Amino acid sequence: MMRLACASPPSYGESAEQGSAGESLRPETALATARATPGKALAVPNDPALPGCALLHQSELRTKVTSRLLANWLGPNEQLLESSAVPWRYVPGKRCNFQLELVIAPAPGAAVECRRVIGKLYAKDHGAKVYRMLQDFRSHGFARGRFLVPQPLAYDAQWKLLLLTWAEGELLRSLLLGDSDVSERIEEAAGWLLKLHQCGVTRGPRLTFRRHLQTLAQQKQRVGEVYPESDGLLEDLLRRIEGRGVALSGWTSRPTHRDFSPDHLVFNGGHLTALDFDEFRHYDPMFDVAHFMAHLRLLGLRNSGAMTRFDDEAERFRVAYQAGAREYSAARLRLYQAVAHFKLAYILAVVVKPPAWKEAVDAFLGEARQVL
């Protein structure tokens, strides 16, 4: 059989946030992004904790499994001829995201077509939960119209494999770094988030502030191990975050993305698709607002050395969100800004360690202290 390859994708999809040197700024190991260097060999994980890793290494098995799972998505006369898998994000022992390129014969005698879907491999059954969550979102207004989520195509319990539709378009991150006017895009991002918080989805896992504090305490310990000079400030911040959070309790949990950032928003014409719902929980909606604003700070720092580069965009986002919010708290926003800056300090110190990482950690911890 003649081998056919899909064309290289433009800058869209679930790429990990990249710094100027291309390293991941998330607590994960990035194997590739939607803009991987042409011709560069990409490492393919062989993780015994991920049953589906075999599908990344065995082409015939992958094509057979994919063909079965996508039988309802493919047309009645369509045949999947072959497939290729390009990993781009890997969390050892937890999950691996990859681009699945499909070569399809639409009908006997017709020219073959190339299509893409998203594949996600999990260690446990979290993919089944994500599948159900996306179904819930789509039944609550995210299947059509201006604001969207990917369509979940299939989940296989044996391989712990989730398949999703590919999101065409441009990442907000790319638009921001392109120095174009993104004012309307920023407001649309706020609109998507408002719709999520108000969509009425009730099913899914829940997060408490106490559990969130436990995660921060673990991150504090890890940062202290590699940067002991920061331990006193970390301890003080954690104590102040706890006190402020207890004082501001009483909020109502809503559906929250919990990883809402410019890396997970894809624009295509009049549509905006949000990606990556692995961290979804019912939680305080103000956390999503603060998380997005903090990641604009990170984007500015890592790509221009100026943490404040996108502060105008962050303020535009906040104002747009507040204008449409049914319930808004400036005090809780400041609390979660401190939390988000605390987390980013952890990522920079423990996960990424870019050049001058201590200065970057100090900057984010300083921001956390300032907003509390």
Where are these regions (language model features)?
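Juxta-kinase regulatory segment immediately upstream of eukaryotic protein kinase catalytic domains
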Residues: R26-S83
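Active-site activation/catalytic loop segments of kinase-like enzymes and analogous catalytic loops
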Residues: F287-A325, V339-A356
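Active-site acidic catalytic loop and adjacent metal/ATP-binding pocket
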Residues: V86-G109, K160-L163, E242-F287
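A conserved alpha-helical element in kinase catalytic cores
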Residues: L56-A71, E113-W159, L175-L196
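All-alpha amphipathic helical-bundle segments outside canonical DNA-binding/catalytic cores
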Residues: R326-A338
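A glycine-centered beta->alpha junction motif in the catalytic cores
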Residues: A157-V182, K195-T202, L216-E229, L298-L299, ...
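An alpha-helical support segment within catalytic cores of ATP-dependent transferases
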Residues: L61-V86, V201-R258, A323-A325
